[in-house]
Design a protein with these regions (language model features):
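Conserved glycine-rich acetyl-CoA-binding loop
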Residues: 93-111, 120, 131-138, 142-143
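Acetyl-CoA-dependent GNAT
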Residues: 9-12, 16-98, 110-112, 116, ...
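C-terminal "cap" of GNAT-fold acetyltransferases
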Residues: 86-88, 123-126, 130-172
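Glycine-biased, low-complexity coil/linker segments
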Residues: 175-177
């Protein structure tokens, strides 16, 4: 059974390994300098996740997924973009490595982010994704996230980080949908 929990300091190495394994598939879709920049950004983000909650999925003592949930009001710098203060909580770096996919791990991590954002009284939850992340985009849309073009930014020439937003005034997505 997969358990969803807050990360522990001892999880740090496994979180980096799981995240890089999950995102490695995008290396082939990006020009080498862009992939190097993206990989470096992932590593820098994971080196100090504050003020985000680092949430993990664990199965049989091994991490099989991870996600960051930044609180509303957090100040951040989007890669290649201007510094922003988050109006709503934001999901970042949802990661499930290939060997753990197809088991609902990503959905469970997203459901936990939604639960926590609602518990904090947030009116919405946001995230960014890109066209190369089509499987993730379908999951987000099935869970009720809708495009929020006003949140888009460009981390590099020709790349658009697409904003998505989930209003939290709606009922929770039902388990098993999608």
């Amino acid at each position: 059974m997969t358990a969803i929990r807050d990360a522990r300091p001892s999880d740090r190495g496994a979180i980096l390994a799981v995240t890089l394994a999950a995102y490695e598939q995008y290396a082939a879709a990006l020009a080498p300098p862009l992939w190097a920049m993206y990989r470096q950004n992932i590593q820098a983000t994971l080196a100090d996740v504050r003020p985000a909650a680092q949430i993990v999925a664990e199965e049989g003592g091994a991490l099989v997924g991870t996600v960051l949930l930044f609180p509303a009001g957090a100040g951040m710098a989007n890669p290649g973009g201007k510094p922003v203060t988050l109006e709503w909580p934001e999901v970042r770096l949802l990661a499930v490595p290939p060997a753990a996919r197809g088991k609902g791990v990503a959905r469970r991590l997203m459901e936990e982010c939604i639960r926590r954002a609602r518990a904090a009284g947030a009116p919405a939850l946001t995230l960014h994704t890109a066209d190369i992340m089509s499987v993730a985009m379908r999951l987000y849309e099935r869970m009720g996230f809708a495009r929020a073009v006003e949140l888009d930014f460009s981390p590099a020439p020709g790349i658009v980080a697409k904003g998505y937003k989930l209003p939290l005034t709606l009922p929770s997505p039902q388990r098993g949908e999608g």
